[in-house]
Amino acid sequence: MKTNGHFKDFAWKKCLLGASVGALLVGCSPHIIETNEVALKLNYHPASEKVQALDEKILLLRPAFQYSDNIAKEYENKFKNQTVLKVEQILQNQGYKVINVDSSDKDDFSFAQKKEGYLAVAMNGEIVLRPDPKRTIQKKSEPGLLFSTGLDKMEGVLIPAGFVKVTILEPMSGESLDSFTMDLSELDIQEKFLKTTHSSHSGGLVSTMVKGTDNSNDAIKSALNKIFGSIMQEIDKKLTQKNLESYQKDAKELKGKRNR
């Protein structure tokens, strides 16, 4: 009986030890440090000098942009709002009064807006950030009880893709007078990044001493800052008073036809 008691005691301790080690192994979860060293500024200052004001109003529609999945919703909203703000500044700098339309659809113009607007500016496009497949590598953590880090890594270069199209409309008819498109893949923007995520397995004992770094969010913000500046620079070049006044005759004819 005594021997049997010792055996049961040993088996119980072994069971507890096994459960403790098992819990330790399952609980191993390496820490990931996400850097936050880049601010999403989205700044642009009109390059041309302010010209003489005109007694003309331009309707500015909200941008109809779509974004890649790796761009956070708050970044999308700021990009859209800053686009409206900076294009408004560019148009004001060219001597126009700007009426902001809280819609991206020209069909939402009120009759009063159609009547008083000399022109309307609409924007649509896709803002895409993607890893360059030629310069990006992925490394997945292998399962293991001891030396598995429990971290998957993707390291490479983030590049832009997509497009932005700006359309100049006559508000009363809704007809397009002109447009221009920017191919974002042609921009010389390259942001190095390291994206670190937890593996599907928990990692081994060594994972408790591992700290992973993830700067992919900073790379996204840096790329968006540069993309925004490039887009605004092109819009600033195109939406000059000289160019916009060249639509005077066509705009007047279209508005006149609808007013008859």
UniProtKB/Swiss-Prot annotation:
InterPro entries: NeuraminylLac-bd_hemagglutn (IPR007876), NeuraminylLac-bd_hemagglutn_sf (IPR038531). Keywords: Cell outer membrane, Lipoprotein, Membrane, Palmitate, Signal. It is found in: Cell outer membrane. Residues 1-27 form the signal peptide. A lipid is attached at C28 (N-palmitoyl cysteine). Residues 134-139 are annotated as: N-acetyl-neuraminyl-alpha(2,3)-lactose binding motif. PROSITE patterns: PROKAR_LIPOPROTEIN. It holds the Pfam family NLBH. A lipid is attached at C28 (S-diacylglycerol cysteine). It is a lipid-anchor. The keyword Translocase does not apply. Its main location: membrane. It comes from the Bacteria. GO terms for cellular component: cell outer membrane. This is Neuraminyllactose-binding hemagglutinin. It comes from Helicobacter pylori.
